[in-house]
Amino acid sequence: MKKFFVLLLAAMMLSVSAFALAEEAGFDEYELGVEGEQEVGFMTMSMVYFQPVDMAPSDLAAPKEGSDLHIEVDLTANENPYSFPVDGWVPYLSIDYVIKDTEGKEVYSGSMMPMAASDGPHYGNNIPLAEGEYTITLYIKSPAENGYLLHVDAETGVEARDGFWTEPLTATWTGWKFVKEW
């Protein structure tokens, strides 16, 4: 029994050491745009970017190679009629984005993928993008588009008896000065 506890203690110490090393070798997130955190519909959202990352399954993700950065939207639910937990991540969203330069010309567009990292679930993607100043607009579509259902009966139903929103919610971050810091 004593050996078990010694081994357990050693394993715990190794885990803590590995975590500390991972923290030291970490990376920096850069805030995207001048708006910072925004209230969008029933959610609080913020955007960051950092170096491109490997993701799995790789056939569903934009590859690290050929990408200049990873963009990420972190979001949590506020009080809402859909019964998403307050301060929890909102699943089943489809989030499209359009990136424009300072002259309003579209330079890149795509979709954010739902994913998880060491800091939790989010929507993001690797993208190619030249250094410069940009505006990014997100178009957040209802979870119903991905087959997410709501109970609407009197006994078990959510507050939102009419279902989800029908037009995409939008959020824009301006004055984003993208500089490759890595």
Q: What kind of region is each of these model predictions?
A:
Residues 1-4:
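Positively charged n-region of N-terminal signal peptides that target proteins for export
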Residues 121-128:
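Exposed aromatic-hydrophobic patches
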Residues 108-116:
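Solvent-exposed serine/threonine-rich low-complexity stretches and specific carbohydrate-binding patches
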Residues 141-152:
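Short acidic/polar inter-strand loop motif in beta-rich domains
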Residues 8-16:
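Bacterial N-terminal signal peptides
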Residues 56, 69-88:
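Short amphipathic, basic-aromatic surface patches that mediate peripheral association
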Residues 23-63:
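Short, compositionally biased P/S/T/A/G/V-rich stretches that sit at domain boundaries
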Residues 132-139:
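A short tyrosine-centered beta-strand micro-motif
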